């Protein structure tokens, strides 16, 4: 669908806008992805990671890596998991802290799978504040549960990177082969309707308070995750651009900024698709 409004930007203004966007990339971003299984987080994370030179931190991947590498946090987690227990919040936060201090996370990070509860969100904020940092954006990948069944049952995953594809909506260039590495894709054994319903019930119960926590902080943006992958990608760019500090004496940027903020919650083609 064509956007109902457009902003004409001259060459100088367009140049300034691109420079501001680059500044945003240089400053770094700390982003939390929240969404149910099948909402498209796994598709969008590599795109945002590449565009903004961020690291993608998935709690499951971090746990496995820490255990395999034998880090102190990994040893603690393994001992607890071997006894059938849940990894405490403090251990998870320490593991995240270890990861964000690596060179790969210098420009910021995408955190996927954490926090799942308000106490976890509070502990994460406290840990970041100790280093004078904070979460910049929380993206809520909102989608109706009924649409997730079709997505989940057709989902394909590249095990080592976590890249996600879909047989119908986002197929790989070659069937069952990862576009980047040429390695085989898999379909997870728990990607079925029965397991999905249980996961969704747990997700909604735990996540609703977390969304409220970030809403109160003014950093929550809700995305219509039922849209196509390119549309969602451009929406994410629009959200990031909407927080740029435009020159106060440039009326064209004030207009653009207002339109961009309006469009974050719109169903129209994001302006970021036309400009960047």
From Swiss-Prot:
This is Adenylate kinase. GO terms for cellular component: cytoplasm; cytosol; mitochondrial intermembrane space; mitochondrion. Residues 58-87 are annotated as: NMP. ATP binds at residues 38-43, 155, 164-165, 227. It catalyses: AMP + ATP = 2 ADP. It comes from Dictyostelium discoideum (Social amoeba). The gene is adkA. CDD domains: ADK. HAMAP family: Adenylate_kinase_Adk, Adenylate_kinase_AK2. InterPro entries: Adenyl_kin_sub (IPR006259), Adenylat/UMP-CMP_kin (IPR000850), Adenylat_kinase_CS (IPR033690), Adenylate_kinase_lid-dom (IPR007862), AK2 (IPR028587), P-loop_NTPase (IPR027417). AMP binds at residues 59, 64, 85-87, 113-116, 120, 188, 199. GO terms for molecular function: adenylate kinase activity; ATP binding. It is found in: Cytoplasm, Cytosol; Mitochondrion intermembrane space. Consists of three domains, a large central CORE domain and two small peripheral domains, NMPbind and LID, which undergo movements during catalysis. The LID domain closes over the site of phosphoryl transfer upon ATP binding. Assembling and dissambling the active center during each catalytic cycle provides an effective means to prevent ATP hydrolysis. One of its GO terms (biological process) is AMP metabolic process. Belongs to the adenylate kinase family. AK2 subfamily.
């Amino acid at each position: 669908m064509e956007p109902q409004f457009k902003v004409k930007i001259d060459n100088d203004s367009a140049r300034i806008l691109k420079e501001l966007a680059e500044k945003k990339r240089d400053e770094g971003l700390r982003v939390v992805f929240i969404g149910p299984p099948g909402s498209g987080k796994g598709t969008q994370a590599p795109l945002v990671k590449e565009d903004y030179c961020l690291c993608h931190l998935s709690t499951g991947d971090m746990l496995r890596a820490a255990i395999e590498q034998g880090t102190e946090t990994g040893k603690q987690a393994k001992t607890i998991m071997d006894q059938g227990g849940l990894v405490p919040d403090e251990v998870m936060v320490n593991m995240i802290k270890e990861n964000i201090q690596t060179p790969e996370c210098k420009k910021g990070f995408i955190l996927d799978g954490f926090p799942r509860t308000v106490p976890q969100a509070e502990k994460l904020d406290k840990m970041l504040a100790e280093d004078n940092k904070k979460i910049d954006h929380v993206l809520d990948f909102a989608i109706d549960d009924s649409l997730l069944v079709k997505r989940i049952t057709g989902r394909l995953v590249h095990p080592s990177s976590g890249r996600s594809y879909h047989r119908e909506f986002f197929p790989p260039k070659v069937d069952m082969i990862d576009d980047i590495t040429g390695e085989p894709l898999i379909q997870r054994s728990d990607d079925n309707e029965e397991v999905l319903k249980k996961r969704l019930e747990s997700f909604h119960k735990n996540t609703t308070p977390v969304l409220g926590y970030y809403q109160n902080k003014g950093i929550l943006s809700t995305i219509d995750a039922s849209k196509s992958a390119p549309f969602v990608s451009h929406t994410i760019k629009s959200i990031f651009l909407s927080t740029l500090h435009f020159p106060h004496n440039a009326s064209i940027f004030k207009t653009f900024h207002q339109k961009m903020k309006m469009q974050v919650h719109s169903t129209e083609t994001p302006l970021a698709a036309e400009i960047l």
